[in-house]
Amino acid sequence: MLLRGSRLGDISGEVLDFISSRDVDLWIAEADVLVDMAHLLMLYERGLIPREDCARILTALKELLAEGFGVLGEGEDIHEAIEAYVIERVGPAGGRMHTARSRNDEVATCIRIALREQMLGLMDELIQMIDALVRIADETRERIIPGYTHLQHAQPTTLAHHLLAHADALIRDLERFESTYERVNLSPLGAAAFASTGFDIDRYMTCELLGFSGLVENSMDAVSSRDFALEVLSDTSILMINLSRIAEEIILWSTSEFGYVEVNDLFASTSSIMPQKKNPDTAELVRAKSGTAIGSLVGALSICKALPMSYNRDLQELTPHIWRGIGAARSSLRVMRGCVSTLRFDFERLERSSTEGFTTATELADSMVRITGIPFRTAHQIVGRLARLPGKPSLEDLDRAAMVVADLRLSQMGFTAEDLERALDPRTNISMRSKPGGPAPEEVSRMLDARKKYLESASSRLAEKRSKVDSAIRRLMEGVDRTVTAT
């Protein structure tokens, strides 16, 4: 094998399979070639390899991209396989591509490039998911629904208010990913094994060619730390927890017991034995994939725990967790966006349900405090006694409850039947809650406008990140072409 050289003897197939990362390395194969190209251009620029050798190696790498990675032979990992491919076509001069470089800084750089690409895609999909929630909220500003605590009817609210709560949680997820991206998009290349190199390299040149925004400066930290990956997996786990809450509500609300929504056929399945069934399978799988993401985080944390400086092969086992976790999140975002966008709401049932369970009790207590001046706790106890009665309470019921609790007649303290009627009306309840963040129509409209502006800004920031990376890679490939054609 190429990297065992004359130091080590042969290795058994079983051991090779055990230590190999080839299958997982396909995630970083294209990134590996980009790293090779940037490193070669830097080596040539610094006078560390001849132009002819640089051009021949770059040509071989371009051919590999055109042919696809299926042409690579066996090897311990993708890095060895690519180098072997180049040497087979270029001869011993192909070995110059590894000058002033270790697999340690190489793989760390490749992971960051591939992860950066995944994060850009995920953030785009997350923006689309938030946009879907905001659009539905915009269309349902005054649709009344029951609000819940402990999964029991609590207070009336609007569907828009409810959906914006989910949107705001996802906005925080987006902000976490944006922040983490800045720490992911740093270059470890040039750190070599861990102690840098005696060759006169230019780390800033490769950093710029690969679209990084800066260096992971300390060479030991650059190759041995994977906290950036842990941070991504943490962000991913929180995102998946938030998505699982939406999924759980879709599952519950689509049951015959709730009957609030119907899942589109595209996102449902039926039973193999019960022909009447329409199961919300996609939502159930999103709920399950939140466990996959959390498991990836826990696995990654466990691998990184107590590793001595600097690089350890344990980190090879971390990489599958990265791709598994972020893959679960991206697929869940795409499916959940489609599922949510095509839900059919039963607005009549939602509004009818909004008054069940005495959901206007809080406003009744508040109204008693405002009109009569009694302490809130007294009002709370009076309304609590009313809640025992069946049906809609009358002013006489209210007076009787007040007499039992506080020896008061609220009707003699200015509280009228009209006040009672207003307090029990769900629309009045909602309209009175106009403070920042409340469900009143004017406040929901303000929040919707703010979220739309936020999404425009977020899309612009993401486009700028994407443009910087794409421009850098384009300049890299232009540099490759110039070097190849100049010979």
From Swiss-Prot:
Gene3D superfamilies tied to this protein: Fumarase/aspartase (C-terminal domain), Fumarase/aspartase (Central domain), Fumarase/aspartase (N-terminal domain)
Keywords, sorted A to Z: Amino-acid biosynthesis, Arginine biosynthesis, Cytoplasm, Lyase
Gene Ontology CC entries for this record: cytosol
GO molecular function list: argininosuccinate lyase activity
InterPro entries in the record: Arg_succ_lyase_C, Argininosuccinate_lyase, Fumarase/histidase_N, Fumarate_lyase_fam, Fumarate_lyase_N, L-Aspartase-like
Catalytic activity: 2-(N(omega)-L-arginino)succinate = fumarate + L-arginine
Pfam families: ASL_C2 (PF14698), Lyase_1 (PF00206)
Pathway where it operates: Amino-acid biosynthesis; L-arginine biosynthesis; L-arginine from L-ornithine and carbamoyl phosphate: step 3/3
Transmembrane segments: none
CDD domains: Argininosuccinate_lyase
Principal subcellular localization: cytoplasm
Superkingdom, natural source: Archaea
Protein localization: Cytoplasm
GO BP: any one term: L-arginine biosynthetic process
Enzyme Commission number, as recorded: 4.3.2.1
NCBIfam families cross-referenced by the UniProt entry: argH
Sequence similarity: Belongs to the lyase 1 family. Argininosuccinate lyase subfamily.
Protein's name according to its UniProt entry: Argininosuccinate lyase
Annotated source species: Methanothrix thermoacetophila (strain DSM 6194 / JCM 14653 / NBRC 101360 / PT)
